[in-house]
């Protein structure tokens, strides 16, 4: 044995028990080395006899190489007994990790080193794997339902995303050009939602303000959309406290501004609602008045047409009656004038009934009548009656 192979590990083997209860069969092991024999380890009658055997494999390698290689036939399987472990893990005496071979079914198998059993087991395992591969190749690939569902959902999601991208940007591949599109878009779309404090100190007079972009460390309040710049030496001590105070001031101002804007919007909303209410009420009142005016106009028009028709129907009779009354009045007036002219006023005695005296001066009475006639002649009524008389005279003449 060379100096490289002189490293040995001590392996403890436990005796294998087979057969009925109480019956024990000692495991015999033979060491292929000339200097070691079985007699040095066997010969003790204790049930729990443990033998220390030298092996050229470590315990870890022994556990990894411990595989089941059973070459018994079906009859030997039936006669072997029921004490074999059902988990499929072989005992140490049945494995090929010992120097003397394996003890299976009462027969000692030679060692795996340099034997043909190793080649036969490898050949059998290769044939078994070929058989499994042939069975797997014989099965036809079937498309299952969940495959169809997954493919259809992926296709629908892709189509909807492309349609949405096209409707928003007009370009189907706009989402895949994010890096270039972000550089080309306006800076306001990127940083317009955040109030950067150091942006005010930037040179706002030049046109480069539109190209401004934040850089460095910022203390950001995402609730109020405020960002305050921080340097590397401003994170501790008084400057950090100052930064917190500035952030608190901007946060409070933003909240007050937000609350004020909300209140103003609420007031403006109430005022707009009141204005709309008054406007709608005025429009409704105006519409109702317009409808009422149309109805009243229609009614008065009907009444006027009715009165006009009645007037045209009764106007000849009224005209005749008026003419007849005018003629009678003229006749009465002319007759009264004649009677007044022919009247001879005699001395009138006082009426005893009324106990008052009437003047005996007849000339004064005549003067009063003449004066009354002159007044009547120059009155409007007399002029109207004279005009009617002239018209009637001309009508009768013609």
From Swiss-Prot:
Highest taxon listed in the record's lineage: Eukaryota
GO cellular component: endoplasmic reticulum membrane; nuclear outer membrane; perinuclear endoplasmic reticulum; phagophore assembly site membrane
UniProt-listed GO biological process terms: cellular response to nitrogen starvation; nucleophagy; reticulophagy
GO terms of molecular function: protein-macromolecule adaptor activity
Residues that span the membrane, as ranges: 148-164
Subcellular location: Endoplasmic reticulum membrane; Preautophagosomal structure membrane
Record's note on what induces expression: Expression is increased by rapamycin, which mimics nitrogen starvation by inactivating the TORC1 complex.
Subunit note: Interacts with ATG8 and ATG11.
Protein name (database record): Autophagy-related protein 39
The organism of origin for this protein: Saccharomyces cerevisiae (strain ATCC 204508 / S288c)
Lineage: Eukaryota, Fungi, Dikarya, Ascomycota, Saccharomycotina
Gene expressing this chain: ATG39
